[in-house]
Amino acid sequence: YTAPGDGDNVKLSRLGGSDWAKTRKKVKAATEQMAKELIELYARRKQAHGYAFPADDTWQGDFEQRFAYEETPDQLTCAADIKHDMEEPWPMDRLLCGDVGVGKTEVALRAAFKCVMCGKQCAILAPTTILAWQHFNTALTRMESFPIRIGLLSRYRTAKEQKETLRGLKDGTVDIVVGTHRLLSGDVKFKDLG
């Protein structure tokens, strides 16, 4: 396999030849090193203590009942699994994936709601500016009846608006921030990220 643009860098070796053996040995060593690092990382994560969120309360039930659509069984399962993970005293390690339109945003918003109603802050990272804007507007609509402040960090915001959001994250007056990779910038500081 070669990636696009790698055509000039491809070198073929004879199977069983010395070049092949050297390449194979290097790849094996690199793979073993990567596996060792992953095992060490997961061991550290298992020993790390995180914040254990309390069980769902009436606010959570009210928020979830206000969803305008009927949840799919998979949505309900995913939301329950994620909230269960949040109630454990160690960092969560979970990836939620699915096709467009299957309800991932609602599952994420339920977790975000649980997070902020317990006094923590939440960051929602989106891969594109348009998706960040959509998530921001969906969150505003879904949470308009609750005491939650939501900010957006993306190129759609003026410098002044971004400064206000950054200040709110640092002092705790912004509960949820939605954004692109901008959220990973060094100037983004949270008061108490959950």
Can you annotate each of these PLM segments?
Residues 133-145, 161-168:
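Short amphipathic alpha-helical segment within the helicase RecA-like ATPase core
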Residues 153-177, 184-193:
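Conserved motor-coupling elements within RecA-like helicase/translocase cores
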Residues 87-98, 106, 119-121, 174:
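Pre-Walker A (Motif I) flank of P-loop NTPase domains
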